[in-house]
Amino acid sequence: MPWDTEGTRRRLKEAATAEFAEHGPDGTTMARIAERAGINKERLYKYFGDKQALFETVLTDELDKLAASVAPVPSGFEEIGEFAGRTFDYQAAHPQLVRLLLWEGLSGGVADEANRTAHYKKKAQAYAAAQREGVLDDELSPEHLVFMIIGLAAWWVSAPQLARMLTGLDDSDPAEHARRRASVVSAAERLARPRR
């Protein structure tokens, strides 16, 4: 029976995603990833190289999944609200992405920085064009607006204990999840709505 290369790679990436999200790049070992996947460590090295390369692969894949899930780039303030809502939904369903980003920030290296920078600049350019057309508020720089929208959607997952202390509920309560999403959408729209 032939070796299932794609299935093996998928299992290794799933195990690596879970390990890196739980322990960060410094606290994760290749041996633990291989053990979690049920695949020998040598195959892990063969497919992904070293631990840093694997972390970068995992994070890049997770960011690609987010981008595909929340596309397209919004241009009006209502669209920005729904973009923020879709981003919130995705991150609530996939909290490992926010954890991976936090670990990346703590570790100092940036995975696929040139491509990610280009991706974010493209969003900021679309916001800038909408600001020039009067569709979006121009009080904030487009770069700051993009960052703030991402932060609105991500912070609930980044600090769930703070959200629980403030609201008395966690995101497993469907009504609370809906309230949080509505707050994210409303706040994003208010940030982007022209004030004139």
For the regions a language model picked out, list residue spans one by one.
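Helix-turn-helix
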Residues: 11, 15-53, 57
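N-terminal intrinsically disordered/low-complexity leader segments
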Residues: 1-7, 196
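Amphipathic alpha-helical segments that line or abut small-molecule/effector binding pockets
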Residues: 14, 77-106, 117, 143-150, ...
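Amphipathic alpha-helical linker/stalk segments
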Residues: 3, 56-83, 120, 128
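C-terminal peripheral helix-coil segments that are non-catalytic and often amphipathic
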Residues: 89-93, 121-133, 151-152, 158-196
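Amphipathic alpha-helical segments used for helix-helix packing
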Residues: 55, 91-110, 159-167
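All-alpha amphipathic helical-bundle segments outside canonical DNA-binding/catalytic cores
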Residues: 114-115, 132-148
